[in-house]
């Protein structure tokens, strides 16, 4: 699918805020977690670190922690280089905590076409920012045929990521996404806003902070929390 994407990863302080806002801090064992465009693991590694610290605080054995990591965490990354970096970063984290390697459920694939037969308690992410003009015709066709928010008009690449995440979210689950502010005003995001209107619990505006100013011009961001 769309490999010509913008690879800009999430700053650590924003990662922590997103996880804090959805209360990813306690009673984490057995709670499923998905990051669907994980890059080199900025968000995923912090979530895994919190999970391990919680388990150790509860006195869980290393074997039980490893089992939980294999069952509770899923991630997807299309770019092969970032996919390998993410696995290496996660394995380094295991080593830091004195844990053996685990079989991570991380997929080097396109989230939009991948089938995951599971729903999640937590979905956190920073989906790729790609405008309609930079999506090739094949991908436009696939997205338009498979996502209600993209049936009409000039959708951005993050729209189907948001819609698909809602499908994977458990009832009562929580989602935190870092997204461009234009979805709140773009005429072509009207159908996406309809999908979101009864589900949003909080919106944080980072326009003044300019999280990605070093890398991207004309992109303001907001964190969107759904419950």
Give, region by region, the residue ranges found by the protein language model.
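Signature of N6-adenine DNA methyltransferases within the class I
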Residues: 3-4, 8-17, 37-45, 83, ...
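Conserved S-adenosyl-L-methionine
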Residues: 4, 9-116, 179-182
